[in-house]
Amino acid sequence: MHTVMSGRSRIAGLEVYVPPARLDTDAVEQRIVESSPGFRIPKGLISRVTGIRSRSVMAESEQASDLAVNAAAKVLASCGLQAPDVDLLVFASASQDMVEPATAHIAAAKLGLSCPVMDVKNACNSFLNGLEVADSLIASRRYGRVLVVTGESPSRAVRWSVPDFATFASSFPGYTMSDGGAAVLLEASEGATADSEPSSPAAEGILGMAFIAKSIHWPVGTLAAGGSAFPRDPEASYFTMDGEKLKDAFLDLGSDVLGETLEALKLNWQDFAVVCVHQVSAPYREIFAERAGVPRDLLVPAVEEFGNLASVSLPLQLKLALDGGRCGPGDLVALVGLAGGVSLGIAVVRL
């Protein structure tokens, strides 16, 4: 475990972009059946297992970078900033436009930025790790203002034609996924000091972050195409996952890091306005919250209407909570990320 006592960077702006095209779960099941001669699934199965009713789908002309850029343009406008005001761009996403160059370059070009850029990738924890990198660089005074963006395009990796139930089961995660983008502007906080007590209103910004991983479980879920292992294999271009093994992997990982982080910061869950937890399905959100001791009334339900947005899930939930009046300036919020590989992370933030 690694906990960073920070307070040196704050969230100056947050925006999310959800493509307008929607695909409900009935239509997903119908497309699977139409694309898979001789294969049938019980009607309503996906909804019953996941609780997901709808998800967003990017346009054929859009790329992952476009989703990030849409959100980034909104956050710069809302903060009254121009391209020269950004010191660093971090593209932090499980998705990418291509292997080379880094998608951060493509996003920067579309935004008209001329600052340094980098990609950060760690499955569904990519955005949370992007915040970690940005916060650390701001704390080191290398950069004063960092734009962290993500664009997730999982709809491009869904297997629609399945020959049998085993293939359907291993491809199941793709049927929960959704496209979207998000952007957070982090900047040095003038109102906080590194030694401010987290419980003090003066402790503004990112107060602490912690991450753990059990990388022995990496084969449980993969999208293997595009690397040296499967450079040209079309079969490797789809999501594959063993749901039961993934559940066991997260049980092995545990959630002690969450309690340890709160203890280090002298906080408990009741101190928070909301707790945003990465949501792969509605049932697993409830199971994880119960095991982690997170009160249900602090959660931000999102997966039912928006699907599994990968690394966009956490910023989307925070945006929903802000827009819905559930949190605001001075409030404590927690971002709890889970990701394939497997890893678990938490960021504690005072808005």
What are these regions (language model features)?
Residues 8-10, 88, 144-148, 332-335:
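Short glycine-aspartate micro-motif
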Residues 1-60, 163-248, 256, 351:
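Condensing-enzyme catalytic core mediating Claisen C-C bond formation in acyl metabolism
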Residues 84-92, 270-278:
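Short glycine-rich phosphate-binding loop at a beta-alpha junction
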Residues 139-178:
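Flexible, glycine-rich active-site loops centered on histidine and acidic residues
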Residues 39-48, 98-112, 150-163, 226-233, ...:
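Acidic-glycine-rich active-site phosphate/pyrophosphate-binding loop
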Residues 15, 92, 121, 146-152, ...:
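Short beta-strand segments
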Residues 23, 100-102, 132, 157-162, ...:
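Short acidic, glycine/serine/threonine-rich loops at helix termini
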Residues 65, 69-72, 95-96, 106-139, ...:
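Claisen-condensing/thiolase-fold acyl-transfer catalytic domains that form or cleave C-C bonds
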